[in-house]
Amino acid sequence: MAPVTATHQEAQESVKNVIQDLLNLMVQVSQYDTNPSSSNNNTPTSSRASGGGGGGGGGHASSRDIIAQSLQTLDASLLSVYRTANLLPSSPSSGPSNNQPQQGTTELERAEAAQFASTFNNTHNPYAPHVHQPGPQNPGIPIPLITYVENGRNPDVYTREFIELVRRSNQLMRGKMHAFRDFRDVLAGEMEAALPELREDIKRVVEATGGPGPAEGSEERAREGVVGSLSAGGEGQQGQGQGQQGQGQQSGQ
């Protein structure tokens, strides 16, 4: 009896079924809804998965049941790919020299298949308990970015809006920091004037919060006030001088 073998066409069909099941699962996940009455019936489903349920129209299944059925269909498709790949004829150069290693290879393949099925169920089944798998993990993608891509929008728009949001948040935080700093200096000056015996404690608290001492802060504010008044007075005197000079020229004419 000749051994049963598979063709490359059958292997390609099995891979196409896996891709179709992955597409159906992606659509179901993107349209996930826990309400059975609002489940989307326009979602493309695999003909292999819905072949036995075409006659039942009594009620709508929830998204959770549909996703579970899609996962089962995907599991069956992956198993079909594995079995078809094992039935493909091997090249003459890669064939074993005798029949003894072939039995060991078959056992090894079975062990690898069982390990793969266990790992797949633990890592890809959302209803299975989470099992930590060693190795590098994929970086998390922000949900808003996925929404932008699904809606056909440019991801650069998300980046630009994110930068603008961060800039506004930084400006707001900077304004709050300056406001609290000014309030700290004013409160320290008032407490120093009302409670002179706590001068050292007030100075220590102000310095611990990143500010100058009350005396230094008051001196700096006094200097700024004097400079501002002098500059304002100089501008006022200059304006008066120019006005008097203009009046003198008009009277001379």
UniProtKB/Swiss-Prot annotation:
InterPro entries assigned to the protein according to its UniProt record, in alphabetical order: Mediator_Med10
A GO BP annotation: regulation of transcription by RNA polymerase II
Entry's localization field: Nucleus
Sequence similarity: Belongs to the Mediator complex subunit 10 family.
Assembly description: Component of the Mediator complex.
Function: Component of the Mediator complex, a coactivator involved in the regulated transcription of nearly all RNA polymerase II-dependent genes. Mediator functions as a bridge to convey information from gene-specific regulatory proteins to the basal RNA polymerase II transcription machinery. Mediator is recruited to promoters by direct interactions with regulatory proteins and serves as a scaffold for the assembly of a functional preinitiation complex with RNA polymerase II and the general transcription factors.
GO cellular component terms listed in the entry, alphabetical order: mediator complex
Keywords recorded for this protein, A-Z: Activator, Nucleus, Transcription, Transcription regulation
Domain of life of the organism encoding this protein: Eukaryota
GO MF annotations in UniProt: transcription coregulator activity
Keyword Transcription regulation: yes
Keyword hit for Transcription regulation: yes
Residue ranges, compositional bias (Low complexity): 34-47, 88-104
Chief location of this protein within or outside the cell: nucleus
Disordered: annotated segments: 32-63, 88-109, 206-253
Biological source species: Neurospora crassa (strain ATCC 24698 / 74-OR23-1A / CBS 708.71 / DSM 1257 / FGSC 987)
Residue spans of biased composition, Gly residues class: 50-60, 231-253
Name listed for the protein in its UniProt record: Mediator of RNA polymerase II transcription subunit 10
Pfam families: Med10
